[in-house]
Amino acid sequence: MMPECGTQCYLCDLPVRFDNYSGCSHACSYCFARHRIDISQISKKETSKALMNFISGARTKETNWCDWDIPLHWGGLSDPFQPCESKYRSSYKCLKIFADENYPFVVSTKGRIISDKEYLNLIKNCNCVVQISMVCNKYDVLEKGCPSFAERLKILESVSRVARRTIARVQPYMREVFLDVYKNLQLFKNAGAYGAIIEGMKFKRKKDGLVKVGGDFVYQYEDIKKDFLELKQKCHSIGLKIYAGENRIRSLGDSLTCCGVDGLSGFLTNTFNLNHILNGDKVLPSPRQKTDGTAGWF
């Protein structure tokens, strides 16, 4: 298997994801992937060889529109640094390739293994943005297979010392913990984060204060907008960037590229998508995107 496109390809600036594991042991009760597949069965998925093939220019029907070194989103559906990595060490092999090739990527994790010395030594030589998923300590009961919020703060601090950039990934955000998140922004800054990504929770059942968007129930626009703008004001007052991971409020963030790679050399994203077009950006397709037969995934 090769890196593949996610379902948000027509909206996302980094739509090509790489998952070297299938399944997850974090046991987060809110996980969206649990509604699609059985994530309790953990196994190796895409290989380091497949990663190297993509970096070398190989493409599939899903990715044949991409004719440049687009940054990969590593860990789109499964955490690369969950406990099974101690057994398989697949992510270590992939990190070595990323470091040797200086290929740009974003990786998302809640796992503690990323802060082990041998992994930090590789990350130090990688062209990457590391996102640590963390909301507040009240989520600890919802994330029973994960390091605690307090431990993840320490992980963020360790990774921030060596990574090119780190981001606190506040996803999924629930309005009940607004004050906790507001206070935690300073903790993220103190730990070395460059910014924070905020994305509201998607619910499967209707509740008061929710509206249906697509197949999910989400917070009403004015409610999530209000919270986001207050968090944005706080972020800017302490020197943090803020990004909106939710499509409806994307333009309220500091960049339409919500994963936190804005301004980094070597991170050429795909801006030829509805996100940029609807927000008034003048974007053009790449030469490959003009070729017949490459638009299927969009």
Locate predicted features:
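Residue-level detection of beta-strand scaffold positions
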Residues: 15, 104-106, 239-243
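Conserved AdoMet/S-adenosylmethionine-binding subsite of the radical SAM
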Residues: 56-227, 234
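Short, glycine-/Ser/Thr-/acidic-enriched flexible segments
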Residues: 23, 79, 249
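Canonical Radical SAM [4Fe-4S] cluster-binding loop centered on the CxxxCxxC motif
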Residues: 1-49
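Auxiliary Fe-S-binding modules of radical SAM enzymes
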Residues: 180-298
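Glycine-rich anion/phosphate-binding loops
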Residues: 45-53, 111-112
